Structures are given as structure tokens and as C-alpha cells.
Regions:
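Bacterial N-terminal signal peptides that target proteins for export
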Residues: 2-16
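Surface-exposed repetitive/solenoidal architectures
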Residues: 29-240
Length: 240
């Protein structure tokens, strides 16, 4: 009788270990799952209220799967959205493989909504890419993005159109109250590299960048290439 109970216990332990192995993703960290915000419906009058990185990732996925007009706002009671579990450099000591952020808005579904950072901060944005249009947002058109600070962003791209906020901001965008802190770094490998946006067609109001920007051609502290519009009270930093 005791032997049967021992076998049952061993089988139970084995099953639990198998379940844990399945839940543990390749790379040594627990899987991060995007989750829909519990407040808002994505309209301009009732934007999705973002309270954590999981909800920002869900918003990204919703935009990139056809919801290109939805609007979002970071919650009043949140100070920081930390993306470290959704994008990070490789770390052998933690058995972590590199995970690059997939931008909001792409060549299939360019973002055209309003995103209000509500005076909050996004930290630990990490991008290391070999394709164009890289930033927190990839491609945006006629959108409004405002009231947002970035800290500890690390963005590298070997192609064109790269910025910490947006890679390509074309055709009538409004960027307002955007701050890139000196804890951020950005390095582009081709045309159009900027601290806030690689390419901008639109208006930029009260935008500041304290990070050093490196690139090869059409490099700017604020934007790499400014097509048209009005920059007002903007402070670029050194571009190399």
C-alpha cells in the first residue's frame, strides 16, 4: 500500500514539473501575456486606460491587427509603465534571450488615433532591429501623441526611419509635450534618425530630447528629417 502511494506521489511530482516546463518559455523567464484594459472602449471620448505594460502590449497588438484608430491614455494613478518584461537585451546570467519591442503601427496598419501619456513615463523600451520604421510607434499618420516621457530607452536599427517615440510620423501628426531623458540612447544605421522621430510631417510642440543621437545620414536631435509643419518650443540635443 505504501509503495502504491509512493508511485502516485512520484507521478504527481513529474506531472507538476512537466506543467512548469510548458509554462516556462524558452529564454528563462515567465511568459508575459498581453491583457485588455478594463476601462474604456478605444474611442476618442472613452480611450482605453493603460495601467501596466501588459495593457500597452495589448493595445499594440490591437492596432497592428486592424484597430488602427483606437485611442488610449495612461491612467491617472500610474506613474511608470515599465516594458522590461516585454523587451530586453540578452542576459546570459539570467538565461534571457534578446527580445526587441514590436512597434505600434506598421506598414499594414499605420496608427491614426490619439495616445495620451498623461504626463507619465515609459521606461526600458528596447529595440534592436534590422528593418525600417522603429520606435515605440512604428508608422503613424494624422495622429496625436502627447504628454509622455521616456527613460532608459535603448533603440538601435540598421535601417531607416528610427526614433524613440516614432520611426515614421507622416502626413499631419501632432507631437506634444514629449521628453526624451539623457538616460536614453538611439543609434540608426541608415537615413532618418531622430531622438523623437526619424521622419516627421506635422507639428511638434514643447518636445525635448536630452539623449545623444547617432546615425549616418539625415540625423537630428529632435527629428532626422522634418518634412513640413511647425516645431514650437522644442529642444534638440547633440546629433552625431
Amino acid at each position: 500500500m505504501k509503495k502504491k502511494q509512493l508511485h502516485k506521489s512520484n507521478r504527481l511530482v513529474t506531472m507538476l514539473l512537466l506543467v512548469m516546463a510548458i509554462l516556462m518559455p524558452y529564454g528563462g523567464a515567465w511568459a508575459q501575456t498581453a491583457s485588455q484594459p478594463s476601462e474604456g472602449n478605444g474611442s476618442e471620448g472613452s480611450p482605453y486606460i493603460i495601467t501596466k505594460a501588459e495593457e500597452l502590449a495589448w493595445f499594440r497588438d490591437a492596432v497592428n491587427n486592424g484597430g488602427y484608430e483606437i485611442c488610449a491614455k495612461i491612467a491617472d494613478n500610474v506613474e511608470v509603465i515599465d516594458l522590461k518584461d516585454f523587451c530586453h537585451a540578452a542576459d546570459a546570467s539570467q538565461n534571457l534571450k534578446e527580445l526587441s519591442w514590436e512597434p505600434i503601427g506598421n506598414s499594414d496598419w499605420s496608427y491614426v488615433g490619439t495616445f495620451d501619456g498623461n504626463g507619465k513615463t515609459i521606461t526600458n523600451l528596447y529595440i534592436n532591429a534590422t528593418q525600417a520604421y522603429m520606435g515605440l510607434f512604428g508608422i503613424i499618420y494624422k495622429s496625436t501623441i502627447k504628454n509622455l516621457t521616456f527613460e532608459n530607452a535603448n533603440v538601435t536599427n540598421t535601417e531607416n526611419d528610427i526614433g524613440i517615440l516614432a520611426g515614421y510620423a507622416g502626413n499631419g501628426n501632432t507631437l506634444q509635450n514629449i521628453k526624451i531623458s539623457n538616460t536614453c540612447q538611439i543609434k540608426g544605421g541608415n537615413d532618418f534618425t531622430g531622438g523623437i522621430a526619424g521622419y516627421l510631417d506635422g507639428n511638434a510642440y514643447n518636445c525635448v530630447n536630452y539623449a545623444t543621437v547617432q546615425g549616418t545620414e539625415d540625423v537630428g536631435g529632435l527629428v532626422g528629417y522634418f518634412e513640413s509643419g511647425k516645431p514650437s518650443k522644442t529642444v534638440p540635443t547633440m546629433a552625431i
